[in-house]
Curated annotation (Swiss-Prot):
SUPFAM superfamilies: Phosphoglycerate mutase-like (SSF53254). Plays a major role in regulating hemoglobin oxygen affinity by controlling the levels of its allosteric effector 2,3-bisphosphoglycerate (2,3-BPG). Also exhibits mutase (EC 5.4.2.11) activity. Keywords: Acetylation, Glycolysis, Hydrolase, Isomerase, Phosphoprotein. The modification Phosphothreonine is found at residue 122. This is Bisphosphoglycerate mutase. Transmembrane segments: none annotated. Substrate binds at residues 10-17, 23-24, 62, 89-92, 100, 116-117, 189-190. The keyword Hydrolase applies. Belongs to the phosphoglycerate mutase family. BPG-dependent PGAM subfamily. It comes from Bos taurus.
Length: 259
């Protein structure tokens, strides 16, 4: 029986989402479509009468801005927002800034799918010569984390994301849910996928099939042990949501005209 409710979502669309590039830890902002997605998400949650007590985000602009816009639509701007690098997107290492379709042409669609969706596969690490290395690691936000700068990842599998996310879930988010607080998590695609895997008990093999579209709220109903009661639910127009999921899946494929 459901005892608690939790809402999570992947942030609204950013410029590099639109350009089909691996964004990861590069701090891209929402584009015009992403801004509207965030507002629509807020309207959807308002129509369902959600009242939040606490919001958790990553320390990436696109997830924070998404949360702000949702709270604005809800008229709940006063709700506390807490941000942590542990909710950041997966670190895609050397793949950061590269075009997914071009990578599929160069390395094959299955390899790109493994890099994007599998549990254990880690992309090649980012090197200091990478054009975005210094932009990431010289950013002040990473100098005030709860781990030293030199211990932050240079590349991650989804397994790595779950391992760095779980302490934050266990120590900060879960206790608030257990206190009866209504919590919103505005994060990234892979941090949300990792948390879904943990809460729903999704297998290492099955997680490759879980895709999250941008800007769509996900409802999780949890029991007293904070395990899901039934599968997660996408809130909104289901036909549009399925089309958005397909769009994300197709990002790692070669367009037919190029085959």
């Amino acid at each position: 029986m459901s005892k608690y409710k939790l809402i999570m979502l992947r942030h609204g669309e950013g410029a590099w989402n639109k350009e089909n590039r691996f964004c990861s830890w590069v701090d891209q902002k929402l584009n015009s479509d992403g801004l509207q997605e965030a507002r629509n998400c807020g309207k959807q949650l308002k129509a369902l009468n959600f009242e939040f007590d606490l919001v958790f985000t990553s320390i990436l602009n696109r997830s924070i801005h998404t949360a702000w816009l949702i709270l604005e639509e809800l008229g709940q701007e006063w709700v506390p927002v807490e941000s942590s690098w542990r909710l950041n997107e997966r670190h895609y290492g050397a793949l950061i800034s590269l075009n997914r379709e071009q990578m599929a042409l160069n390395h094959g669609e299955e390899q790109v799918r493994l890099w994007r969706r599998s549990y254990n596969v880690t992309p090649p690490p980012i090197e200091e010569s990478h054009p975005y290395y210094h932009e990431i690691y010289n950013d002040r936000k990473y100098k005030v984390c709860d781990v030293p700068l030199d211990q932050l990842p240079r590349s991650e599998s989804l397994k790595d994301v779950l391992e760095r996310l779980l302490p934050y879930w266990n120590e900060r988010i879960a206790p608030e849910v257990l206190r009866g607080k209504t919590v919103l998590i505005s994060a990234q695609g892979n941090s949300c996928r990792a948390l879904l895997k943990y809460l729903e008990g999704i297998s290492d093999e099955e997680i490759i099939n879980i895709t999250l579209p941008t800007g769509v709220p996900i409802l999780l109903e949890l029991d007293e042990n904070l395990r899901t009661v039934g599968p997660h639910q996408f809130l909104g127009d289901q036909e549009a949501i399925q089309a958005a999921i397909k769009k994300v899946d197709d990002q790692g494929k070669v367009k037919r005209a190029d085959k």
